[in-house]
Amino acid sequence: MSDIKVGVYFCTCEGELEKAIALDSLAQEASGRPGVAVVRKDPSLCSERGIGAIREDVKKLGLDRVLIAACSPSLKTKEFADLGINKYLVERVNIREQCSRSHAGNPSNATKKARAILGMSLEKIRHSKALEPVTIPAVKTALVVGGGVAGINAALDIAGTGAEVFLIEKKPFLGGKVSELHRYYPRLCPPSCGLELMFSRLESDPRIHVLTSSEIESFSGSPGNFSVSIMTSSSDAIKSPEKNQHRTIIAGAVILATGWEPFDPTPLTEYGYGRLEQVITNLDFEKRSREQKQFLDQSKKTAFIQCVGSRDERHLPYCSDVCCMVSIKQALLLKEADPDNEVYIFYNDIRTPGEYEDMYRQARTSGIKFIKGIPSEVRQDGQGKIGVSVFDTIAGERTEVAVDLVVLATGMKASRGTTELKNTIGLVTNKYNFIESHLQCHPLDSQREGMFTAGCCRAPMDVSRSIESAGAAAAKALRYLQDEITVSPDYPVVDILKCDRCKRCMEECPSKAYSFDEKGFPKVDSLKCRVCGICMGSCPLGAISLGELSIEQLSGMLDVLDKSYLGDDEPVILGFLCKNDAYRAADDAGLKGIRYPSNMISIMVPCSGAVNSMIVSEAISKGVDGVLIAGCPDSQCHYIQGSALAKTRLADVSNKLKDMYIEPERVRFASISRDEPEKFAETIKEYVEELKKLGKNPLRII
């Protein structure tokens, strides 16, 4: 460490930290460490005065590294962003939230833990490297796949920023399913009004190129420079396939708006669809009422059956979101045509969020009868009527009504276009075949950088939500519609001298950011990479490291960790905490003054899936008593599968420990959400007690 100059700075946080930690003692010890050129203590390092002092030292003393022992690295990020030195050569040491505040009742142990953390951080920073953002040329052209209302609106919004747009549609015409509708809800205006305006804007905008009868043939490239091969069918392509047109589009971003398809109720034979002509679907209703002027006057008694195929494990297990409102709208149209029309809606649950409750109230006021119960049978009664039999769960009796028309409220399912694109582009879909990412945090993303979803390819939704999602997707795409894109440099790096080309990194990368070079070695596309670190955790040879956290750094930190920093009888735990949830829960424990034992040293990782089994095994082999990996619950993982992979890998380590006659309980995984500081503290307490019962790690050398 003598070849570099390190500045070590302690913040007292206006005296708070000195109440629990002997900072003067730590500062004196730090000044004697190899490579440490200056040690300072300041009551408020994040103040202008404190920041200025660090900058002055960097300039005058020629510091190569800066270590700040203060609050959590999750805090004050802007204040410490520019210290006059490459930000990747600055190390934040959390001695407040996860040390002084969590162990304020035991200053001696808090100081010992702070000393251990400081030593590990100094070792880590020794291996830190200056990294610079990478700038990559890009194009201001977007590709929008799907010509329904979502795709059209996304194209118009993007073109409005000055970018060029290619809008491709599989069918010979634009408009999607909306072009088949009779009326929108809640205003009950005709879709033709909005569509004609959209078509006019498309036609008049020279930046938008519309390609109908077109499909994606092949797809390659990266965000900013996707290469997409498009085939456009000619009108006589059946007779002369060679007349099909082929072109390649270079696009900076892609909007996926591949729409939806209606559920086919034919398998539900109890409803007679396809057998009884008086039984139609809700989409059939739209088409007939739009095309046949007298349709709404023909039926004097009409029954709507909700959830046909939806919320049914045999067919569509999910709610399709729009069906209740569609039936209420259609029922109101019947009442508008003839107020004496008898209308029944058979339902499981009526779902009318927000202002849509007004339409539900209007429907009840107009005399539409709502009967809670799903009909068991629909049959012809011999007199030209359709008999609908249902058990009314509110009245507690079976009811049968004779009607002229039955409308089945069928749900939405993912389109064939989405399924086809899944294979062509390499999309990730959920179990229902809708395009998926992290629904809570990144609902418009597709798990593929530079590709965003709009409309019903993501989930069932109505027209207004589809248009809303299109605008949001267009806004997110703008980042990639630039002359050049700047990429964070902390993406993973592969050491090809260690790599045996096993392909594990490629298989487990949730962003599909890996490909292989001409020699078969993995290479990462920095534009596709989300820097989750799952590839680093996957490599059985430890050949992959992140720019900001390397295998070498982690191994070095283990070497300098005092395995008995609290005393010979106290277990030492090494904790790997995911930065999005578990680490923040640990910080919150400190902020709330929640006490827990000082036996754990935590290392923040981008995802629990970034922890390599080699490091876990190395920690145990070097005498650490226990290793805890804490990450998001599976359903909340920001990188979809990181937590699940971490648990699988940890199970493998446990089995190896058994073979070594070492207790497998020395490694464990904990699911801890961002808002569970109490659970975090309780987890540490329980683990410390369990390790005390197990006794000292037999590999610990005193």
PLM features per residue range, with description:
Residues 1-574, 578, 583-585, 589, ...:
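Residues forming the flavin
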Residues 664-702:
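Divalent-metal-activated hydrolytic enzyme cores
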